């Protein structure tokens, strides 16, 4: 057995920070995408100006909080919840909110889906659903998140989702949430808006 002490002056490599188009991301440890703005989130955010103005919004599976921070900056009247089950993600998201000056309007919670959120409490849910669990590819996570979103949305509320186009989530979104329209599509991703009936 061999143990070493930290190298003097090496410092803790976490958290890391990066700025993308004026949006500061802060990442701790294993938060998805780290300080990068993943391509799905980047594509969803190109439609930020078309998203409804919500008083109560949720960033479901928030990761480092990029979507919540961007929405909060664009919509100062909104109050948001940023939710993720990962401790690294929620710690990162809290710091991202502080770095972007929106911490007083975005409550970051560690939750499995939206289990702690009341029914009918949101006007808008924003989602970039994971399709990996560890190293395994899975399509089982997204439908559960769609159901959580449907439960917390008020009638007429919207779920905006970005997803890898090959996953073809639209029929599930129609069945679980409600009428779904395509907002945009590129070579890899689709953005949809589903209205809770």
Q: What does each model-found stretch correspond to?
A:
Residues 1-18, 164-197:
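Class I S-adenosyl-L-methionine
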Residues 1-56:
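SAM-dependent Rossmann-like transferase core, predominantly class I methyltransferases
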Residues 39-127:
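Conserved SAM/SAH cofactor-binding pocket of Class I
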Residues 82, 161, 182:
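Conserved SAM-binding loop
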Residues 84-88, 141, 164-165:
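Short beta->alpha hinge that forms the Motif I/post-I loop of the SAM-binding pocket
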Residues 124-136:
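A short SAM/SAH-binding and catalytic strip from SAM-dependent methyltransferases
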Residues 142-155:
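A short glycine-rich, Lys/Arg-flanked "PGG" loop and its adjoining helix->strand segment in the class I
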Residues 156-162:
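Conserved beta-strand signature within the Rossmann-like core of class I S-adenosyl-L-methionine
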